[in-house]
């Protein structure tokens, strides 16, 4: 326990919260270029082929970023926009590709939750 005199001299130090998305550098999104687009398998007990892109950001960080939705048009040298948000069953993947921004196409035939996948509103018949 600190004495009153010690507290007057030094004061209490605030504990700083560590960012879960350091590569964004306190920005909402960052632009980058895909260096590798690949699939990977999730941790147990899940089983799938998850689509992931290795992205080199404008601030020269290189991060793994998840490509959500069914199907995508990304390949090497595609320009993408990434946002924060980890994928729980993929270790080391702490970012998401924003669908419908830059070179990333939105998800075709998406009816629900369209804003999250860059899909336009379907035409009324």
UniProtKB/Swiss-Prot annotation:
GO biological process: translation
Cited PROSITE patterns: RIBOSOMAL_S12
Protein name, per record: Small ribosomal subunit protein uS12
Origin organism lineage: Bacteria, Pseudomonadati, Pseudomonadota, Gammaproteobacteria, Chromatiales
HAMAP family found in the cross-reference section: Ribosomal_uS12_B (MF_00403_B)
Signal sequence annotation: none
GO cellular component: small ribosomal subunit
Region feature Disordered, mapped onto this chain: 1-23, 102-125
Gene responsible for this protein: rpsL
Organism of derivation: Halorhodospira halophila (strain DSM 244 / SL1)
GO molecular function list: rRNA binding; structural constituent of ribosome; tRNA binding
């Amino acid at each position: 326990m600190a004495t009153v005199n010690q507290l007057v001299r030094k004061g209490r130090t605030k504990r700083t919260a560590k960012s879960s998305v350091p590569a964004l550098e306190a920005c909402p999104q960052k632009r980058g270029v895909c260096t590798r687009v690949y699939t990977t398998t999730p941790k147990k007990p899940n089983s799938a082929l998850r689509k992931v892109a290795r992205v080199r950001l404008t601030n020269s960080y290189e991060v793994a970023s998840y490509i959500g939705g069914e199907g995508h048009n990304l390949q090497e040298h595609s320009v993408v926009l990434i946002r924060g948000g980890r994928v729980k069953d993929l270790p080391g993947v702490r970012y998401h590709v924003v669908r419908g921004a830059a070179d990333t196409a939105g998800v075709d035939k998406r009816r629900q939750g369209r804003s999250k996948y860059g899909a336009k509103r379907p035409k009324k018949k």
